[in-house]
Amino acid sequence: MPPPLTTPLTTLLRIQHPIMLAGMDQVAGPELAAAVTNAGGFGTLGGARYTPKMLKEMIAEMKDLLDRKDAPFGVDLLLPKIGGGARATNYDYTGGHLDEMLDIIIESGATLFVSAVGVAPQWAIDKLHKAGVL
């Protein structure tokens, strides 16, 4: 069998295969994220509309399903722009708990933070990078 394909993505994320699960709202739950990670790809847990407590529980459930407890994984939160020219239908999916949710992501040992909708505020990016989260 040929060796696994090595790419900048596989090297950066410490994965076998250059396959990355999209955070896909709550569809990319603990079972799917763990399955992708266990298969050698990069599992990303979708964290849309979770409370901090729910996010912590979902991450714990996913980690329980991992074959390797130190396996890399990511968390995706929806952070659309609010106010200042943003669409009137945008709202804060974190319910004002972004800072607490970032603490949970950092404490969980997540490798990567994803914001598929919107750009995280600079303070959040700085906090994640300072903690070693990509």
PLM regions: where:
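Active-site entrance/lid segments in N-terminal catalytic domains of soluble metabolic enzymes
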Residues: 1-134
